[in-house]
Amino acid sequence: MAEWIALDQLLLEARPQRSVGLCDGEVIDHAGFRQRVLAWRAAFAAAEGRDWALYFDDAVAFAAALFGAWHAGKRVFLAADNLPATLQALQPQVSGFAGDVSADYRSLVALDAALDDELQALDERACELCVFTSGSTGQPSAIGKRLDQLAREVEALQAAFGAQMEGVQVHGTVSHQHIYGLLFRVLWPLAA
């Protein structure tokens, strides 16, 4: 993997030589990813309410919306899936939805943003998300996480496994909508 970038500083400058991943079959470099984040930041900044639910099938699209929401000062709720019962249960807790959800939920869409828009470092203690347990022992329970907690997890992964990761591609079997997929499939590869 490439040079380490702390998650709170991930998008301060565009790095076109750095690959982020594939989105809809297209290779996305860091500069392109940053532009997607700016577009989502514009959308979330224009949207009322603090709490937004995200569900995306694609991990890169998800990551862009996640960082866009955080850069707009929003708290993110990760829906475990996009089934009607899940979205209906989540609806009273959030201001709206973004991503691959039924048209009934009027998903927020990314807006155009200038390529030269600036992004500030994220406040790791202010950026929040809420993940849900699987519900295997009852109803899914909400678990709040801050970016500083997620960043420490990612740093621990890098310390334990980073030396073995040079030049590898990351393939995930756990959805990025769940904590392990979020850490292993999205946040760690972005930082590394």
Question: Predicted segment positions?
Answer:
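Conserved AMP-binding/adenylate-forming
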Residues: 42-82, 168-176
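Conserved pre-ATP/AMP-binding loop-to-beta segment of ANL
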Residues: 2-6, 11-16, 114-132, 163-171
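Flexible, low-complexity linker/hinge segments
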Residues: 102-127, 144, 153-154, 159
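Short, hydrophobic beta-strand segments that form beta-sheet elements in well-ordered domains
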Residues: 52-53, 77-79, 91-101
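Conserved AMP-binding loop of ANL adenylate-forming enzymes
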Residues: 54, 161-192
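Conserved AMP-binding/adenylate-forming core of the ANL superfamily
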Residues: 8-9, 15-46, 59, 145-148
